Regions:
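Residue-level recognition of the GNAT/N-acetyltransferase active site
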Residues: 78, 83, 116
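Acetyl-CoA-dependent GNAT
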Residues: 14-18, 22-73, 78
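C-terminal "cap" of GNAT-fold acetyltransferases
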Residues: 116-117, 136-151
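Conserved acetyl-CoA-binding loop-helix of GNAT-fold acetyltransferases
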Residues: 82, 88-101
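Conserved GNAT acetyl-CoA-binding A-motif
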Residues: 96, 103-116
């Protein structure tokens, strides 16, 4: 990547599919990158492109209640994917920070996610807490934990 700071931009849903498939569907029983909430009103897709205009990071932000506090607004983070060649470079944190800004515009109290165990340390480093026991997520068949952050 160049020395300029990567810029987070809003994406069309379809722009997320190739990167989601490459990162989030590798070694899983499915190759379908679509989520039911992709077209739900209020859903926002964020991304970062490299200097060649290739999408290298994406995340999806869905207004969805947090199960332990249903009376307040919450935003679910879905589809956080950073290209393998760019992982551990700070792009996930940039997407997270932009998503938090978005959630605050909605007066959300929480951001939550179903975090893959492989990415759990990222969420914990970024002030999320793990809630409850781990579980195997149905679509990917990978171990996950619920994580939440109050904002």
């Amino acid at each position: 990547m160049s020395n300029t700071k990567p810029k987070v931009v809003e994406l069309q849903t379809s722009e997320t599919y190739d990167l989601r498939t490459a990162v989030l569907r590798a070694d899983t029983p499915t190759s379908d990158p679509k989520y039911a909430e992709d077209t739900k009103q209020g859903t926002v897709h964020l991304g970062i492109f490299d200097e060649n205009k290739t999408l290298i990071a994406t995340s999806t932000w869905v207004i969805n209640p947090w199960q332990h506090d249903l009376l307040v607004t919450a935003v679910q983070l879905r589809g956080m994917a950073v290209a393998t060649s760019h992982q551990k470079s700070g792009l996930g944190k940039l997407l997270l920070d932009a998503g938090i800004v978005h959630a605050k515009t909605l007066d959300a109290k929480y951001i939550w996610a179903k975090a893959r165990d492989l990415a759990l340390a990222f969420y914990l480093r970024n002030n999320f807490v793990s809630v409850g026991d781990g579980f195997t997520e149905g679509v990917t068949q990978m171990p996950h934990h619920l994580v939440v952050r109050e904002i």
